[in-house]
Amino acid sequence: MRAFGKTVLLGVTVVTALGISSIAFSQRLGKNLDEINQLANKEKNVRVATSWEPENEAALLKGFTQKYPGIKISTDRISGIDTRERIMNEALAGIVDHDLVNVSGELRNQYIKAGVLAGPIPWRNLFPKINERHFSPDGYFAASGFSTYIIAYNPTLVPKDKVPKSWNDCLDPYWKGKLVVLTRPRTFTGLAPGWGEEKTLAFARALKDNQPVWKSSQTGALTQVAVGEYPMICGMAYHSLKSTVQRDPTAKVAYAVPSDLPFQIGEAMGIMKGAKNPNAALALTGWLVTPEGQKNMDLEGRSSPYVPGTEAAELVKKHNAKIVFESWDALQHEAEMARKITGAWGFPKGKN
């Protein structure tokens, strides 16, 4: 695992479509799984830009390395928008260092429009037994990880009879001026496809009226809850809470699973056009979406709720929760919904 930090100066050079075409077909994708696997074994390498936790990688990828012992996986850890934009800009300049990239939701359409991705790929034909929600309708992405959002709290500060059971419990006057709400409203954009715009914005306004403590850092807010500065966070990513507990099992944090449980595509893998090892990248992605791969994604707290036996599926089952899924199509409207929610909170336009 390496931190991704290469900088490319593009200057004022205009990169044309011909500039990309020279690297676009340096390698070809196999026509079927047998051919893909044969070519993947010949490529022998795959380089991935991902947000996997370094300590989880060996166990996460164990099944793949056993199936493909001749393929070496190298990873670069990326986070946020900047590193992913850099990868896209480098590709436009003809530099393709990664075979497989976890592209964040805000940039997926940009990657497609820029022409830096291989595809469309017939994911659903290649992997007909995998739930179709794992594959984008346009054929450019496969979801290897999902994000779900829960309510985090400090069990020493929250009485048992006040442990929330639904999102509406965040509106209880008991929490007025006490609970934390994150300024990036991923929880509530995730609920919007199931709730509808009217209900989502009405809830956002009611939440604001409960005078929450606004925080921009999810990790920082959870640390403050753990040390007792605040009792609760109304909406945060389950995988972030899990990562905190893995690092410090004594952390005083617990979580409640609301009756409406939002799931979003948290890790969308795209194969880069001009990748040196596109078949190995496709083989790895195909393995990640299998039941075995998704069980291993439990380590990250990002498994699929649509694969029986995963942590995510058991979370839904145990708490009798209703899945609210933000589909690939709904993701296109997420930024607009985020602006409306933060507008209802009284934030300046563009803050989300």
Question: Where in the sequence are the language-model features?
Answer:
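A bilobed periplasmic-binding-protein/Venus flytrap-type ligand-binding module shared by bacterial periplasmic
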Residues: 152-157, 192-195, 265-277, 296-297
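Extracellular/periplasmic bilobal clamshell ligand-binding domains
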Residues: 311-352
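Periplasmic-binding protein-like
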Residues: 175-184, 189, 287-311
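A structural signal for short loop-to-beta-strand junctions that line the ligand-binding cleft
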Residues: 92, 96-103, 116-152, 168
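Early extracytoplasmic/lumenal segment of secretory-pathway proteins
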Residues: 27-104
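Ligand-binding pocket segment of bilobal, Venus flytrap-like solute-binding proteins
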Residues: 178-257
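Short loop->beta-strand "edge-of-pocket" segments that line small-molecule binding or catalytic clefts
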Residues: 43-49, 168-186
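Short beta-strand->loop
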Residues: 118-125, 139-142, 245-246, 250-263, ...
